[in-house]
Amino acid sequence: MTGSLLDQLRQMTIVVADTGDIQAIEQFTPRDATTNPSLITAAAQMPQYQQIVDDTLKQARAELGPEAKAAAVATLAFDRLAVAFGLKILAIVPGRVSTEVDARLSYDTEATIEKGRSLIAQYEAAGISRERVLIKIASTWEGIRAAEILEDEGIHCNLTLLFGVHQAIACAEAGVTLISPFVGRILDWYKKETGRDYEPHEDPGVVSVTTIYNYYKKFGYQTQVMGASFRNIGEIVELAGCDLLTISPKLLEQLQATDAELVRKLDPDQAAGLEIEKIDMDQATFEKRHAEDRMASEKLDEGIKGFTNALVALEKLLADRLARLEGEVALNQAFESIFRTFDLDGDGFITREEWMGTDAVFDAIDLNHDGKITAEELGAGIGAVSKLA
């Protein structure tokens, strides 16, 4: 008997849980886990984690003082909350957790460095070795340079929002610990651009990750490849053998429920024998290739905006929760603002493209799985009552 796809995948690839839901992590027992503002936002709405949110807000208020504006307290609380969830996750997984730098700093090298140092300091103050934490940074040229400096300080980085081979090469040359190429978002772009569907073996996201993996193994780079943002288990099957794959709970369930033979598709020995041209990636070459790669440039910009929107939404939720804790009631106003932040065209629905956050969060909120989030669904998801005009 071959066993489940998930069990077989674990024999050739490190499986990472793409969620902030601690109970889901306990269910699937991954080695590592990743978080981002969208995942933290979803987890923060779950009743079982409300005490973590409340304690974090109270700590941030005490740290900044009674005169500090709620927005400032919420911003500080986000950093603290990301670490608080990270600590809970690290009590379960044997490996590492990825914690994300504010996406609004994506083009600011110095600010990214300072934020990375701050996050690591918080983990170390809680008794966690920096070896168990990856700092997630967007794969801009400025972000890659920040990661290079952090890596020199022993702070390991996960470069995210990676869509082009040029980004991957720059990360490897910078000595980054790990990259997260976004398989599903690459597929989304090509489907929209061409109007056609793709079989898993020809999926542009799968092809991109395969190319990056083979390049790394051919030239002996130590940077690990962690495929991310999957749309279906077919993509995962085609990347069996990749260093790591970060997978949402929904797809982990499908892999666990599917019994079929899993064939390894990515292999370092095979990659070493391929004929591949080596490219030196200085800033001029990076910027030229990025400008020429419309998919990568559009998806990077979109991803940064999406993570920024998720962070803004989370900060609004935290500010509202703080107001409730301090005796002010503003939940409905905050909810309306959050819904309109994501409903870009004002049609009363949030599509997956408008959401631009993590697929796991979208799927959790999209209760009827029709590809659109209504005001009622978002209201249920964040515990608010929808009273939009």
Swiss-Prot record:
The biological pathway it contributes to is:
Carbohydrate degradation; pentose phosphate pathway; D-glyceraldehyde 3-phosphate and beta-D-fructose 6-phosphate from D-ribose 5-phosphate and D-xylulose 5-phosphate (non-oxidative stage): step 2/3
- Coding gene? tal
Any one GO MF term held by the record is: calcium ion binding
- Name of the protein in its database record: Transaldolase
Pfam family of this protein, just one? TAL_FSA
Q: Which organism is it from?
A: Gloeobacter violaceus (strain ATCC 29082 / PCC 7421)
The record lists Ca(2+) 2 as bound by D366, N368, D370, K372, E377
What EC number(s) does the entry state? Answer: 2.2.1.2
CDD domains listed in its UniProt record: EFh, Transaldolase_TalAB
Source organism superkingdom: Bacteria
- NCBIfam families xrefs: PRK12309.1, talAB
Q: Which top-level enzyme class is recorded in the Swiss-Prot or TrEMBL entry?
A: transferase
Main localisation, per the record? cytoplasm
| GO terms for cellular component | cytoplasm
Domain annotation EF-hand: ranges: 330-365, 365-388
Which positions are catalytic residues?
A: K136 (schiff-base intermediate with substrate)
Q: Which Gene3D superfamilies has this protein been placed in?
A: Aldolase class I (3.20.20.70), EF-hand (1.10.238.10)
Which region is the signal sequence? none
